[in-house]
Swiss-Prot record:
This is RNA polymerase sigma factor SigS. Residues 126-145 bind DNA. InterPro entries: RNA_pol_sigma-70_dom, RNA_pol_sigma70_r2, RNA_pol_sigma_r2, Sig_transdc_resp-reg_C-effctor, WH-like_DNA-bd_sf. It comes from Staphylococcus aureus (strain Newman). It comes from the Bacteria. The keyword Lipid biosynthesis does not apply. One of its GO terms (biological process) is DNA-templated transcription initiation. Sigma factors are initiation factors that promote the attachment of RNA polymerase to specific initiation sites and are then released. Sigma-S contributes to the protection against external stress, thus playing a role in cellular fitness and survival. Belongs to the sigma-70 factor family. A motif (Polymerase core binding) lies at residues 29-44. One of its GO terms (molecular function) is DNA binding.
Length: 156
């Protein structure tokens, strides 16, 4: 499928996402980044997959936009400094709060659970994760429940 056809049929997804997150400042820049990502996604989409193109684009563009927000605010999130130091004499170290939480979560998980979580956060569906990890769908569901249980037990 040519990108012009994809664009004509699905460009409203970009407008919807920008409206959903109330983007008014830098609207054109975000639109352009999402349009480039839409082109990239249209190149890797497999029509034989069970997911429709519109669903595929919406999910991946939504996660991409969230990643853009995180990158933009990465230096604004958390500043960590030593408790003993009354003044900042050294360069402060910046950490993204989400990255710190993910690091804590990843420490609790085994290798299969970490891979599942990574793929899930990238926007893959369960059946896609099952194909990538070469596991059955029921095993993927068990891994999902295990990750959920560990997170609830340790972070709630």
């Amino acid at each position: 499928m040519k990108f012009n056809d994809v664009y004509n049929k699905h460009h409203k997804i970009i407008h919807h996402l920008l409206k959903k997150y109330n983007i008014s400042y830098n609207y054109d820049e975000y639109y352009q980044l999402l349009l480039i990502k839409m082109w990239q996604l249209s190149q890797i989409y497999k029509p034989s997959s069970k997911q429709s193109l519109s669903s595929f684009l919406f999910t991946r563009l939504n996660f991409y936009l969230i990643d853009l927000f995180r990158q933009q605010n990465q230096l604004k999130d958390v500043i960590l400094c030593e408790n003993n130091s009354p003044t900042l004499t050294e360069q402060p170290t910046y950490f993204n709060e989400h990255d710190l939480r993910l690091q804590d979560i990843f420490k609790l998980l085994n290798q299969r659970e970490r891979l599942w979580l990574k793929l899930y956060l990238e926007g893959y569906k369960q059946f896609e994760i099952a194909e990538i990890m070469s596991l059955s769908l029921s095993t993927i569901k068990l891994i999902k429940m295990s990750v959920k249980r560990k997170c609830q037990h340790n972070f709630n």
